[in-house]
C-alpha cells in the first residue's frame, strides 16, 4: 500500500519468514525433493527483492499467488504423509485446511484495506472486493472458537463495514493492520492446535 506506518512490522515479518525458510531449507526429508517448495522459495526471494518498487495491486497479486502455492504444498505434504488415510483425522482434515483459507481471506482483506486506509479513499471495485472477503470471513467464524476470538473477528468485520468501506475511511493504517493481524494470528493458533492433535 506504500504506507510507511507499518514498514517496521513488515520488516519484522520478513525476518521471521526468512528464518523459517532457512530452517526448512536445512531440513532433511520430503520437502528437499519437492519442486513446489523450490518454486515458492524462489518466488518469495523475487517478491522480497522487488516489492518496494511495484504498486500495491501487483504486490497483492504476487502474494495471493504465493499463498495459493503454499496451500498446494500443504496439500502435497498431507498426501505424502498419508494424513487423509488416518481415520481419526479424516473429518478434521477439511477443518484445519479451511483455517488456512480463512487466514488467506483475512490477509487479502488486510492488504486491500491497508491500501484504502492509507489513501483515505475506497473505490467501488475495492468495496466489492472487501465485501466479498467480508462475507467469506464472516461465514467461517466458528462457534467453537473462544468468545474473545469471535469478538475480535466481529470487531474486525465491523471496522471493515463502518471505517474502511466508506466514503472517508476513518481508521489509521496501523490500527487496521493490528486488528487484521490479530485475527490472522487467532486462526493460525487454531490451526496449530488442530495439527498438534494429528501429531
Predicted features along the sequence, with ranges:
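Hydrophobic alpha-helical segments
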Residues: 1-199
Amino acid at each position: 500500500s506504500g504506507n510507511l506506518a507499518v514498514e517496521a512490522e513488515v520488516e519484522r515479518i520478513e525476518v521471521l519468514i526468512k528464518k523459517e525458510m532457512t530452517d526448512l531449507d536445512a531440513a532433511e526429508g520430503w520437502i528437499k525433493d519437492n519442486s513446489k517448495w523450490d518454486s515458492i522459495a524462489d518466488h518469495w526471494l523475487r517478491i522480497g527483492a522487488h516489492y518496494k518498487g511495484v504498486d500495491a495491486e501487483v504486490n497483492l497479486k504476487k502474494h495471493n499467488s504465493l499463498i495459493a502455492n503454499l496451500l498446494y504444498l500443504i496439500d502435497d505434504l498431507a498426501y505424502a504423509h498419508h494424513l487423509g488415510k488416518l481415520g481419526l483425522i479424516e473429518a478434521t482434515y477439511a477443518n484445519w485446511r479451511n483455517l488456512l483459507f480463512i487466514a488467506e481471506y483475512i490477509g487479502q482483506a488486510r492488504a486491500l484495506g491497508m491500501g484504502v486506509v492509507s489513501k483515505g479513499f475506497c473505490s467501488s471495485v475495492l468495496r466489492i472486493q472487501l465485501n466479498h472477503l467480508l462475507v467469506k470471513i464472516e461465514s467461517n467464524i466458528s462457534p467453537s472458537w473462544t468468545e474473545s476470538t469471535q469478538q475480535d473477528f466481529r470487531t474486525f468485520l465491523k471496522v471493515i463495514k463502518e471505517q474502511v468501506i466508506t466514503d472517508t475511511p476513518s481508521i489509521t493504517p496501523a490500527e487496521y493492520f493490528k486488528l487484521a493481524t490479530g485475527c490472522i494470528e487467532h486462526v493460525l493458533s487454531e490451526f496449530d492446535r488442530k495439527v498438534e492433535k494429528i501429531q
